[in-house]
Swiss-Prot record:
The active site is at residue 229. Pfam families: Pkinase. SMART domains: S_TKc (SM00220). The keyword Transferase applies. CDD domains: STKc_Mos (cd13979). ATP binds at residues 100-108, 121. The keyword ATP-binding applies. Its EC number is 2.7.11.1. Residues 94-370 form the Protein kinase domain. It comes from the Viruses. This is Serine/threonine-protein kinase-transforming protein mos. It comes from Moloney murine sarcoma virus (strain HT-1) (MoMSV). The gene is V-MOS. It catalyses: L-seryl-[protein] + ATP = O-phospho-L-seryl-[protein] + ADP + H(+); L-threonyl-[protein] + ATP = O-phospho-L-threonyl-[protein] + ADP + H(+).
Length: 374
């Protein structure tokens, strides 16, 4: 095993028999208790019975079947549903490659799993808010049962990890693409031969991407799931030029919101994209995601940053003075097409959630707009 590293570093100890391109982080010891009642969230194939073998990362001793496992199986955490404690990752089939990015609660790496490209997310335990890290891990699994072209799919998950690592858990996800919508909007793609921003974000491309995102939201909302952190950085663009909503660390099930009467600290997200009712600490609804989509569409159209200034002042002005990004630019006022975009965006970020369109109506309007353009 490689030498363990401090919490602030991203390199990671990995079993020597892994096929590696570079060092990354593998999750932490023990099993993390869930703050949510999550027994319904994982499909059966991701949570085998307690008689199954440990899903801990393989380290030393070969067992009868020829696979490598920890010498002893860690005890199941008290309070965890029996099946949830046995997430299933075949670690011998994981080939870690390189880090794609990092955020407040962990890092994401590119890898292969059973020879297929995947992304591996590891949630750090060394953070300022351990409970928030735990919530982020379990929230990612809200979509474990879901399959949709515009949603990044969860492949497998585990809370069992080597003793020296700094991770609460590992989630293996479909590899949604090398580029985010944020990178496309602001011209910071990692593609070896990037197109110009203008070529990538023609009106037709904006509407195509918008429909991808709204299709994903419509599906999520039909499953009673709210994303609650929709923004360009959390939208991946695949090699097939399809947008996929990713990063569900702030997501919530509607029934959990109603039951727990979530207070503001239960809902994370990005203040520039948060609806006024979320900033006020009210219970979230699907219309909060529609608001975030409105800001995102404005970014695609203008290729500008939504706000400048201190976050607390922006948040106050959004709630108290109905502050929004400017719709006065020529892109919105110089043509009938621009005015149509202006109306769609304005409807999405209405102050009152009830006045915003639902995902189904928004999908219909965008399809009609796209069709009218030919």
């Amino acid at each position: 095993m490689a030498r363990s590293t401090p919490c602030s570093q991203t390199s990671l100890a990995v079993p020597t028999h892994f096929s590696l391109v570079s060092h990354v982080t593998v999750p932490s010891e023990g099993v993390m208790p869930s703050p949510l009642s999550l027994c319904r969230y994982l499909p059966r194939e991701l949570s085998p019975s307690v008689d199954s073998r440990s899903c801990s990362i393989p380290l030393v001793a070969p067992r009868k079947a020829g696979k490598l496992f920890l010498g002893t199986t860690p005890p199941r955490a008290p309070g965890l549903p029996r099946r949830l404690a046995w997430f299933s990752i075949d670690w011998e089939q994981v080939c870690l490659m390189h880090r794609l990015g990092s955020g407040g609660f962990g890092s994401v790496y590119k890898a292969t799993y059973h020879g297929v490209p995947v992304a591996i997310k590891q949630v750090n335990k060394c953070t300022k808010d351990l409970r928030a890290s735990q919530r982020s891990f379990w929230a990612e699994l809200n979509i474990a049962r879901l399959r949709h072209d515009n949603i990044v799919r969860v492949v497998a998950a585990s809370t069992r990890t080597p003793e020296d690592s700094n991770s609460l858990g590992t989630i293996i996800m479909e590899f949604g693409g090398n580029v985010t919508l944020h990178q496309v909007i602001y011209g910071a793609t990692r593609s070896p031969e990037p197109l110009s921003c203008r070529e990538q974000l023609s009106l037709g491309k904006c509407l195509k991407y918008s429909l991808d995102v709204v299709n994903g939201l419509l599906f999520l909302h039909s499953q009673s799931i709210l994303h609650l952190d929709l923004k360009p950085a959390n939208i991946l663009i695949s090699e097939q030029d399809v947008c996929k909503i990713s990063d569900f660390g702030c997501s919530q099930k509607l029934q959990d919101l109603r039951c727990r009467q979530a207070s503001p600290h239960h809902i994370g997200g990005t203040y520039t994209h948060q609806a006024p009712e979320i900033l006020k600490g009210e219970i979230a609804t699907p219309k909060a995601d529609i608001y975030s989509f409105g800001i995102t569409l404005w970014q695609m159209t203008t290729r500008e940053v939504p706000y400048s200034g201190e976050p607390q002042y922006v948040q106050y002005a959004v709630v108290a003075y109905n502050l929004r990004p400017s719709l006065a630019g020529a892109v919105f006022t110089a043509s009938l097409t621009g005015k149509t975009l202006q109306n769609i965006i304005q409807s999405c970020w209405e102050a009152r959630a009830l006045q915003r369109p639902g995902a189904e109506l928004l999908q219909r309007d965008l399809k009609a707009f796209r069709g009218a353009l030919g």
